[in-house]
């Protein structure tokens, strides 16, 4: 394996822990088998020696991704190159086995192999290394042995089985692969040399009891084996040559899933090395072969314009320029292959519509004659939308091409359908194309099957169903005469409804309907009633399949349909007042136009319908009279008894077709609205993420925006800063943690206060950051602010712009957004970067880095950025679309700021930005880093990126990708380096360098001769260097750019007005910080961060549980579950009794919120009985027609009556995770939630128990029994909560965090492991068998989930092709994993522990 390839592969990562638990016996910690289906594995753990020995005999394991170099075999040996060679090797292996080995195999395979009597000779290579290799193997064997084996020779001859074990287990523990190809080859040779050779062993074993004469006779008869050494040597030399020529590839070492995860598949490499922007390749992968014609390109521009224009709200006279701008942007994307940042930065003039008008201010002689006004046609979001619509249009054209091909094939069979020919060019949506496709399959199904049969596509020639047969019999029989008698075709009826052309009125048949039906009787339909029934069915199907009729329905529904929700029986009890879906439970009569302005509401409706909680109804309002309108279009103009009967017949056939059309159109409309609403919420998420990214580093007063500050950060985590240690970290500008430590109580301990003062004065930070994940952090914030003021701790000096004097201000204490730090503190990245720091200190480090550059911290999260909260309903969005939208926001911001390419080579945090640079992506970013490293590890100029043969520089990127990324990768200007170009440190694209140089020359007032002389002597960048050296950049402001821009457009057809302005700005301030100032959190944001509550989840009128802390004569201080304090006045407790008679310290009671001060984390509460009797009702302002108040009241009464009948007193626990569910309901509720989500619910075991249900994986839920102890009242939560008689917690939050969430992290760690298979146990065993069949000389193992026993996984392993698959239960526990009674903290320890355990067992068996 080459070094370059090895660098692409990281070692086994230490992933976050995530585990699950099970229910235990309360006294002994043993599993309760009576409830095993729900909470335990039911797997008996038998430690019997014979059982273990049997399992060991069935096979041992070596990772399938480890090289099989032992035994002289390489991957080349595994392949069946020559049958003779394989037989030769097989005989060698058999010859190495002694009697004990054969007995062992015989027990496993059911028979004993025949002994081998023939031996082969092999040439030894590098024999001098035998001794060393033997020592290595002996060391591994002796790990498990107390005795020292002194006789190496004896071990070689008489203990061959131990060699066999060493071969198999040599690389059993996961190790890195050699970096050096020579080292890899050396190891292969070592393995061959170290293997005990059968010829030596065989000779000694077979001739030990023979005397010399006998040996001479045997040699005379059979020879000594040397006669044919030359042939064997030639054969082995040929094998060696083939082995050397066949290089090891990544796919020989890693599984496809691993290569895919690491972006190292052949497809990834193709993307990596293709000279096209990576994001374009991925987006257009499906339509790689689709080439748009010039006419289709124009059509696409019109199609996208029509999609975007209605939402822009621009003046009507800008519609034509808007369409041209869209067309030009498409040209940039498709023809020039440049990405959004490039277009926005370097083609900005094409996104504007400029007007040149005569200056109205003619009185001012110095005023210009003309003024320029500009209208912004497209913004950056529009460019991303155009790119998205381009993919949709390609999908549309691809489907239309397939449809046209089908029509052409039918025309080849002399089938012409004018309606299809007319409607295909008119179609503008995928739905309309699908309607046409459905119509073709309905109308010409048999012909299409014949075409498919001719083409050999047997999948389309399956036997038609009974419905198709019926319709075909009607179509080909006499009954179709009745269909014609309806007077007009289904398509013509649709035309009438759509008002297309002149209305055609149906003619009534000369006979009455029944008489006509009787006349059409045949062998298929033997009665008139059958004829009428079949004809109705046929015509209704024709109406249902009519593309025009569907279009009429669809248009009408979009225009006038109203949407209502109806709760199901399941949703009646599930959706209670606190349920997130309550706001849609009784929603009714909502116009589509209104719902699209509340996208969250409709997404909740669709999700609730998927969960079976509600049904969504789309109805045409009665005032619209939609069905009656259709009746009228189908009526004849005749008046008679016969005409009336035909009118009734037509009405019946419409009534038959209407529900079918209504159902399919309603489904289609709902999906279209869902997609629209998803796009709207995705847009909101993107905007919110962009807002967080659009923050420059924190700027202390007097510093230039963009300067990185030195930060001191403190945090108390979840603890009380008055009682528990406060962690702090000091982080320099470059992100290094220089110093860290702990402090005590800063409010009262003077010694600690002085220590803090000394720290600040010694380190002189630019700012103090603070954060935490509890409401107690507010105390720390107040303590720090008080300390700064009391001790006079000042920030850095800065120049006062008013007085020009230097002064200082008190050091600012900033509460920092900690959403990134919370993910970082326990991540594998944090553990790798700061293994010696505790989680809270690592949290402080992340907070400091966030203040130094928020964008880099978000980029470092990678895929985890999707787990942050941007919108309350983001869980209702497709995960892949959300990730793509978030990535687009990062792309915008990274390219706005640019990336110092040389800094990226030395700093991983900066390198994390490279995938978001225009033209690049995760694959190309790694390629860029490796190529630059190959070129010496640094970039001198932007031109070097496309290669420089003269200086031996290899190309880093291709020309097209370079064109995309060049201006966004900057190189700091070095005045002392003559080859350094100042423009390489700007946002100016190399294609515009000549413009920049000309502007510099004009600013310096140099003529052409001066410019030529300067450039001839010092190179093309000399003029700009001179401008910088003379510090004359401000002179570019004196240039009149308008005339120059007009000249460029007139002479070269280049629109560069905005580009010239960019060049002017960059010459004055290269890559100036354009992000907004660091955003300080608002009071409500701080409240949410510290408490987890929002103004919607904790507000006035809510009834919450509170814990009484202090009781005075006229008030009480209480604490809410979220951690904030509350005050209850005496008159808000009771009018009749003293407050001390009602309340006592430590008591838990219910209280109603009267007012909340979100800034001070204080609430005013009432405990009066009359106030508590009025429940909180979420405000719903939908009007009487928009909410079904009658059904709501009836449902509440029904539930009350049911509770009275059952006599059930529902227990209520005031906790955000508590739900009044049973186990099944909890599983249904958690079904749509992410893994690890928790529901606390009443227990069927009584009021001294609670049940906790959490989602282990999709369809797998664990139910945990929690015993409550030290309960104050029957319904109060116990002060001690015990799980399984083994784990004890003091409150529900601790139980969730330390028990359930800890297990969830372990489960996630296991499921993200390379060895995890997202399959059932049976499928995993099949996979192992298939893998071993393909790799017969390997052993392997895998993990899979045990769906029958939540919280358990199977460790399945297979030692060889003939061995059975053995499965061992692995249990997730809060501290790690448990296997066979042993606990392991993480997956690496679990895997290695498993291997060591079975290696040990096998070694012991070998010794016996």
UniProtKB/Swiss-Prot annotation:
Cysteine-cysteine disulfides: none
GO cellular component, one term: transcription elongation factor complex
Gene Ontology terms describing biological process: nucleosome organization; transcription elongation-coupled chromatin remodeling
One Pfam family in the UniProt entry: HHH_7
Keyword Nucleus: yes
Coiled-coil ranges (or none): none
Key words, A-Z: Chromosome, Nucleus, SH2 domain, Transcription
Protein name: Transcription elongation factor SPT6
């Amino acid at each position: 394996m080459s070094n370059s390839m090895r660098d692409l592969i990281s070692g086994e990562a230490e992933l976050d822990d995530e585990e699950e638990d099970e229910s235990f016996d309360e006294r002994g910690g043993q599993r309760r088998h009576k409830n095993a289906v729900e909470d335990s594995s039911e797997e008996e753990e038998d430690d019997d020696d014979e059982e273990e020995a049997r399992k060991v005999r069935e096979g041992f394991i070596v990772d399938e991704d480890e090289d099989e170099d032992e035994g002289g075999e390489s991957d080349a040996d595994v392949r069946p190159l020559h049958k003779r060679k394989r037989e030769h090797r097989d005989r060698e292996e058999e010859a190495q086995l002694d009697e004990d080995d054969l007995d062992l195999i015989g027990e496993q395979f059911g028979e004993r192999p025949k002994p081998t009597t023939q031996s082969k000779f092999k040439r030894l290579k590098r024999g001098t290394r035998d001794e060393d290799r033997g020592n290595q193997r002996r060391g591994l064997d002796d790990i498990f042995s107390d005795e020292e084996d002194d006789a190496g020779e004896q071990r070689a001859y008489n203990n061959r089985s131990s060699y066999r074990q060493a071969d198999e287990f040599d690389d059993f523990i996961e190790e890195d692969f050699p970096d050096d190809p020579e080292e890899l080859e050396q190891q292969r040779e070592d393995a061959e040399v170290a293997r005990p050779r059968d010829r030596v062993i065989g000779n000694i074993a077979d001739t030990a009891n023979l005397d010399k004469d006998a040996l001479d006779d045997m040699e005379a008869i059979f020879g000594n084996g040397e006669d044919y050494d030359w042939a064997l040597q030639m054969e082995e030399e040929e094998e060696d040559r083939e082995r050397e020529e066949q290089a090891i590839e990544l796919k020989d070492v890693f599984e496809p899933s691993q290569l895919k995860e690491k972006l190292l598949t052949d497809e990834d490499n193709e993307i990596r090395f293709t000279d096209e922007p990576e994001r374009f390749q991925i987006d257009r992968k499906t339509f790689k072969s689709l080439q748009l014609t010039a006419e289709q390109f124009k059509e696409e521009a019109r199609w996208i314009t029509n999609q975007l224009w209605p939402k822009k709200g621009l003046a009507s006279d800008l519609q034509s320029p808007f369409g041209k701008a869209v067309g030009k942007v498409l040209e940039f994307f498709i023809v020039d292959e440049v990405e959004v940042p490039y277009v926005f930065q370097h083609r900005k003039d094409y996104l504007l519509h400029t007007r040149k008008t005569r200056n109205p201010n003619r009185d001012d002689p110095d005023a210009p004659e003309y003024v320029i006004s500009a209208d912004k046609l497209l913004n950056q979001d529009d460019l991303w939308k155009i790119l998205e619509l381009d993919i949709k249009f390609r999908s549309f054209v691809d489907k239309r091409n397939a449809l046209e091909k089908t029509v052409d094939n039918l025309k080849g069979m002399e089938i012409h359908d004018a309606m299809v020919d007319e409607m295909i060019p008119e179609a503008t949506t995928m739905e309309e194309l699908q309607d046409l496709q459905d119509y073709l399959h309905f109308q010409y199904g048999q012909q299409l099957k014949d075409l498919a049969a001719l083409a050999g596509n047997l999948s389309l020639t399956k036997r038609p169903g009974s419905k198709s047969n019926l319709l075909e019999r009607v179509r080909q029989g006499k009954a179709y005469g009745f269909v014609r008698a309806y007077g007009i075709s289904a398509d013509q009826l649709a035309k009438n409804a759509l008002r297309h052309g002149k209305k055609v009125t149906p003619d009534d048949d000369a006979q009455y309907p029944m008489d006509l039906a009787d006349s059409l009787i045949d062998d298929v339909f033997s009665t008139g009633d059958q004829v009428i029934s079949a004809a109705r069915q046929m015509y209704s199907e024709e109406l249902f399949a009519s593309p025009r009729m569907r279009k009429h329905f669809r248009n009408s529904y979009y225009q006038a349909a109203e949407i209502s929700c109806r709760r199901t029986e399941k949703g009646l009890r599930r959706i209670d007042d606190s349920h997130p879906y309550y706001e849609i439970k009784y929603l009714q009569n909502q116009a589509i136009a209104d719902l699209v302005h509340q996208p969250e509401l409709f997404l909740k409706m669709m999700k609730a319908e998927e969960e079976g909680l509600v049904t969504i109804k789309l109805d045409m309002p009665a005032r619209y009279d939609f069905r009656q309108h259709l009746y009228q279009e189908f009526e004849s103009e005749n008046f008679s008894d016969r005409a009336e009967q035909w009118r009734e017949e037509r009405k019946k056939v419409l009534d038959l077709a209407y529900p079918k059309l209504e159902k399919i159109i309603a489904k289609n409309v709902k999906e279209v609205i869902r997609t629209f609403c998803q796009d709207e919420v995705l847009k909101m998420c993107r905007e919110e993420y962009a807002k967080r990214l659009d923050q420059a580093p924190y700027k202390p007063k007097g510093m230039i925006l963009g300067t990185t500050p030195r930060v001191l950060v403190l945090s108390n985590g979840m603890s009380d800063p008055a009682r528990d240690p406060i962690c702090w970290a000091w982080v320099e500008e470059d992100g290094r943690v220089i110093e860290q430590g702990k402090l005590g109580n800063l409010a009262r301990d003077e010694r600690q206060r002085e220590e803090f003062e000394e720290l600040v004065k010694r380190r002189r930070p630019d700012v103090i950051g603070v954060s935490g994940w509890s409401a107690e952090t507010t105390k720390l914030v107040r303590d720090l602010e008080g300390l700064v003021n009391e001790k006079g701790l000042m920030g850095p000096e800065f120049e006062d712009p008013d007085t020009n004097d230097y002064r200082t201000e008190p050091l600012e204490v900033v509460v920092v957004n900690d959403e990134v730090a919370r993910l970082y503190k326990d991540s594998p990245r944090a553990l790798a970067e700061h293994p010696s720091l505790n989680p809270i200190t690592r949290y402080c480090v992340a907070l400091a880095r966030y203040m130094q550059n928020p964008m880099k911290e978000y980029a470092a999260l990678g895929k985890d950025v999707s787990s942050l909260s941007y919108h309350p309903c983001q869980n209702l969005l497709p995960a892949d679309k959300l990730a793509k939208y978030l990535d687009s926001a990062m792309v915008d911001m990274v390219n706005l700021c640019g990336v110092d390419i040389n800094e990226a080579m030395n700093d991983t945090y900066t390198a994390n930005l490279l995938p978001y640079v225009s033209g690049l992506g995760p694959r190309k970013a790694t390629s860029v880093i490796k190529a630059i490293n190959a070129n010496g590890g640094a970039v001198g100029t932007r031109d070097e990126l496309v290669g420089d043969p003269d200086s031996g520089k290899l190309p880093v990127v291709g020309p097209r990708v370079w064109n995309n990324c060049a201006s966004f990768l900057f190189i700091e200007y070095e005045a002392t380096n003559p080859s350094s170009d100042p423009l390489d440190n700007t946002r100016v694209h190399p294609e515009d360098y000549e413009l920049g140089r000309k502007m510099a020359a004009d600013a310096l007032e140099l003529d052409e001769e001066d410019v030529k002389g300067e450039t001839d002597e010092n190179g093309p960048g000399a003029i700009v260097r001179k401008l910088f050296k003379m510090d004359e950049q401000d002179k570019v402001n004196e240039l009149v750019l308008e005339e120059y821009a007009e000249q460029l457009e007139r002479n070269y057809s280049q629109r560069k007005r905005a580009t010239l302005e960019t060049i002017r700005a960059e010459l004055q301030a290269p890559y100036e910080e354009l992000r907004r100032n660091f955003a300080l959190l608002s009071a409500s944001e701080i409240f949410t961060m510290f408490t987890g509550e929002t103004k919607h989840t904790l507000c006035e009128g809510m009834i919450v549980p509170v814990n009484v802390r202090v009781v005075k004569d006229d008030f009480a201080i209480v604490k809410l579950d979220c951690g904030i304090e509350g005050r209850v006045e005496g008159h808000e407790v009771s009018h009749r009794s003293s407050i001390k008679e009602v309340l006592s310290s430590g008591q838990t009671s219910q209280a109603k919120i009267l007012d909340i001060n979100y800034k001070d984390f204080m609430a005013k509460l009432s405990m009066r009985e009359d106030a508590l009797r009025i429940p909180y009702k979420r405000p719903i302002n939908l009007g009487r027609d928009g909410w079904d108040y009658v059904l709501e009241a009836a449902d509440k009464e029904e539930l009350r009556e049911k509770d009275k009948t059952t006599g059930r007193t529902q227990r209520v626990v005031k906790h955000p995770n508590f739900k009044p569910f049973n186990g099944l309901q909890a599983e249904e509720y958690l079904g749509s939630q992410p893994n690890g989500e928790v529901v606390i619910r009443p227990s069927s075991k009584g009021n001294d128990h609670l049940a906790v249900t959490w989602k282990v994986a999709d369809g797998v839920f664990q139910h945990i029994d929690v015993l409550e102890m030290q309960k104050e009242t029957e319904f109060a939560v116990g002060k001690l909560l015990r799980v399984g008689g083994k784990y004890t917690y003091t409150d529900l939050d601790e139980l969730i965090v330390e028990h359930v969430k800890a297990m969830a992290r372990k489960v996630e760690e296991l499921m993200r492991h390379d060895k995890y298979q997202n399959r059932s146990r049976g499928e995993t065993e099949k996979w192992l068998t298939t893998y071993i069949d393909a790799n017969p000389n390997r052993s392997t193992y895998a993990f899979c989930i045990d769906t029958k026993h939540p919280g358990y996984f199977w460790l399945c392993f297979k030692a060889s092709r003939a061995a059975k698959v053995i499965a061992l239960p692995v249990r997730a526990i809060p501290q790690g994993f448990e296997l066979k009674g042993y606990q392991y903290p993480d997956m690496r320890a679990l895997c290695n522990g498993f291997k060591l355990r079975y290696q040990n067992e096998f070694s012991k068996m070998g010794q016996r």
